[in-house]
Amino acid sequence: MDQLNVKEQQEFQQIVEQKQMKDFMNLYSNLVSRCFDDCVNDFTSNSLTSKETSCIAKCSEKFLKHSERVGQRFQEQNALLMQQGPK
């Protein structure tokens, strides 16, 4: 990053932010799709049943915790690779 001029740093930052937003939207989309498919079964009403609401809450919590754990493992592996240096 230090080798980039100010304009290049700004462009790089914008690319990183766009990538982060895309990743967040993919995570959100996957969460909605998975939890809806697993939890919503009754289409006779325009509102969720208490069972469906509870299922969605548990499903989304589990999904987000799993995603957080995966992210932590990637960070740990990246730190380990950085310590080892180039091969």
Swiss-Prot record:
**GO CC, one annotated term:** TIM22 mitochondrial import inner membrane insertion complex
Topology in membrane:
Peripheral membrane protein
Q: What is this protein called?
A: Mitochondrial import inner membrane translocase subunit TIM9
One Gene Ontology biological process: protein insertion into mitochondrial inner membrane
Q: Which organism is it from?
A: Candida albicans (strain SC5314 / ATCC MYA-2876)
Molecular-function GO term, any one? unfolded protein binding
The entry sums up its family as follows:
Belongs to the small Tim family.
Keywords annotated in UniProt: Chaperone, Disulfide bond, Membrane, Metal-binding, Mitochondrion, Mitochondrion inner membrane, Protein transport, Translocation, Transport, Zinc
Cross-referenced Pfam families, in alphabetical order? zf-Tim10_DDP
Q: Where is the motif named Twin CX3C motif mapped on this chain?
A: 35-59
> What is the protein's quaternary organization?
Heterohexamer; composed of 3 copies of TIM9 and 3 copies of TIM10, named soluble 70 kDa complex. Associates with the TIM22 complex, whose core is composed of TIM22 and TIM54. Interacts with the transmembrane regions of multi-pass transmembrane proteins in transit.
| Gene of this entry | TIM9
Please describe what this protein does: Mitochondrial intermembrane chaperone that participates in the import and insertion of multi-pass transmembrane proteins into the mitochondrial inner membrane. Also required for the transfer of beta-barrel precursors from the TOM complex to the sorting and assembly machinery (SAM complex) of the outer membrane. Acts as a chaperone-like protein that protects the hydrophobic precursors from aggregation and guide them through the mitochondrial intermembrane space.
Predominant localisation class: mitochondrion
